[in-house]
């Protein structure tokens, strides 16, 4: 406890004695609440626990019929994703003795469960905790001190631990016994060059600083012990490979398959916080991740992984990667010089489960994960750009290509400033092509409200601005040059002088007294049986088939 008091003293907190008692009580209450929660809720710390949880909630279907990992499994899963269907566990897969799990996080609700949350509303609470850690400010009041103290205490609880008899080492295969073709890898689209790994955690280490990076990258099968990797040049693993090349060293790599979905969410969160992904996962889950040392490389992996692939990348050794379906909804191009991974060891649990997913036009699992992350990012973005009241990354725009910002507009040009601040607030927003800015009273999650704001408040000559030749997603082939493209901002806010010299008209609204009277008399009109809460988009000309 003394470390926290020193922290508060450092920042000049005057009511240390009172704060200490309150903080200690807060932490003790937190620990008691966690113990109580253990009795009534499954703590998801590995994939099998999550599968059990989904089955208990009626959100899992076991498929015992023989299925083919070549196209068939993906087609079945795609139909589930389109309709928000249950997770699927294929127990009889052609050519492999391993089961295949897919669509585990096919809804935002299941993503929340994976993160030990019950409801999407709790995602912003988690985001507030991360915002405190991202840029801690000196506490000025007792409640602020408690909030910061609890956040720092959560960091201590989230520290990873070492497991010396990990489940992922129950079976060990080395040398000639390493055969990736025996794994039930999926080929998703008929034009894919080969089978792919999509939900493997790639763990690498900086050869100089020893900093570990955990990322999710698409791998493509090349031979029984080799794969190629597709990644962006800004990712952590690519920096590690460049440093290894400068030193003339191989880059050691571990691919953890079938991990706790919570860890996948942590690895998919590219937040600029000086925390490892393992610590991040511990913050997400409320307790530290159990790690195990690999057999042939100097890396650690989640101890409860279903499978682990251990290997190396030799700088300059490459293979032909692609084509393969990607998140843009098209086949990606062929990379003639993709980094080549050589694997010398496979470890796995007894009767391992292969967890997978696939990319493509939404809805896909990555889109559901992005919707959850959107809620987590919101408090962090508000901290960076306080005038942003809310923001939304629509799934149909690939979850990052278009952002809709609701701002508390205070002065002329405020919308443009908010857009520019958004693009630089977090690294992942660098690749957002379109930013639409609306007033704070606009429902940014209702496309009708957003389109109305654009149609009624935008003069294209005045309110649309373009930034040319900015860093861009190299997989976005809409640009003329790979890795370089433009960005567009659309100011759909109410205008004020000197943005306009014309009087801005007042929007139409129902008379509040009349609306209240109609609410009271609704049953008297004989209309109580009508359900006006659900909107049928077909009534407004939309075709949502």
Please report, for each region that a protein language model flagged, where it lies by residue.
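Extended, highly charged
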Residues: 39-340, 344-545
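Generic detector of N-terminal low-structure segments
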Residues: 9, 15-18, 24
């Amino acid at each position: 406890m003394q470390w926290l008091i020193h922290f508060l003293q450092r920042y000049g907190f005057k009511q240390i004695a009172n704060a200490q008692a309150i903080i200690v009580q807060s932490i003790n209450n937190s620990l008691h609440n966690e113990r109580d929660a253990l009795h009534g809720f499954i703590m998801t710390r590995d994939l099998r626990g999550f599968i059990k949880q989904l089955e208990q909630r009626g959100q899992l279907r076991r498929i015992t019929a023989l299925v083919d990992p070549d196209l068939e499994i993906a087609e079945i899963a795609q139909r589930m994703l389109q309709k928000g269907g249950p997770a699927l566990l294929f127990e009889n897969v052609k050519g492999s003795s391993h089961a295949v799990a897919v669509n585990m996080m096919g809804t935002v609700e299941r993503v929340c469960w994976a993160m030990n949350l019950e409801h999407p509303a709790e995602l912003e609470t988690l985001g507030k905790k991360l915002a405190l850690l991202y840029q801690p400010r000196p506490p000025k009041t007792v409640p602020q001190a408690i909030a910061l103290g609890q956040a720092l205490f959560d960091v201590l609880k989230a520290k990873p631990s070492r497991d010396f008899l990990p489940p992922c080492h129950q079976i060990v295969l080395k040398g000639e016994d390493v055969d990736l073709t025996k794994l039930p890898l999926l080929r998703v689209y008929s034009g894919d060059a080969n089978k792919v790994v999509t939900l493997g955690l790639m763990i690498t280490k900086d050869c100089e600083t020893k900093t570990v990076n955990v990322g999710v990258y698409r791998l493509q099968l090349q031979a029984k012990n080799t794969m190629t990797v597709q990644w962006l040049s800004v990712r952590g693993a690519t920096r590690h490979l460049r440093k290894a090349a400068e030193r003339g060293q191989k880059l050691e790599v571990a691919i953890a398959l079938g991990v706790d979905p919570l860890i996948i969410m942590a690895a998919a969160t590219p937040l600029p916080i000086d925390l490892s992904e393992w610590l991040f996962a511990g913050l997400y889950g409320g307790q530290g991740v159990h790690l195990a040392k690999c057999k042939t490389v100097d890396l650690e992996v989640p101890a409860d992984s279903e499978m682990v692939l251990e290997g190396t990348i030799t700088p300059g050794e490459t293979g032909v990667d692609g084509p393969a379906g990607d998140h843009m909804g098209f086949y990606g191009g062929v990379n003639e010089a993709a980094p080549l991974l050589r694997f010398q060891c496979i470890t796995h649990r007894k009767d391992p489960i292969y967890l997978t997913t696939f990319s493509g036009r939404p809805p896909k699992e990555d889109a559901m994960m992005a919707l959850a992350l959107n809620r987590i990012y919101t408090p962090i973005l508000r901290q960076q750009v306080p005038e942003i009241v809310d923001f939304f990354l629509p799934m149909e725009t690939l979850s990052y290509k278009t952002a809709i910002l609701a701002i508390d507009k205070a002065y002329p040009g405020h919308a443009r400033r908010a857009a520019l601040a958004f693009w630089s607030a977090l690294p992942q927003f660098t690749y957002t092509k379109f930013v639409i800015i609306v007033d704070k009273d606009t429902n940014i999650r209702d496309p009708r409200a957003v389109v109305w704001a654009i149609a009624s408040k935008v003069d294209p000559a005045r309110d649309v601005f373009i930034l040319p030749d900015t860093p861009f997603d190299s997989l976005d082939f809409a640009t003329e040059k790979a890795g370089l493209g433009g960005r567009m901002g659309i100011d759909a806010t109410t205008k004020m002088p000197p943005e306009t010299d014309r009087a801005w008209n007042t929007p139409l609204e129902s008379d509040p007294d009349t609306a209240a009277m109609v609410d009271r008399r609704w049953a008297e009109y004989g209309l109580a049986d009508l359900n006006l809460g659900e909107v049928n988009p077909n009534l407004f000309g939309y075709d949502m088939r």
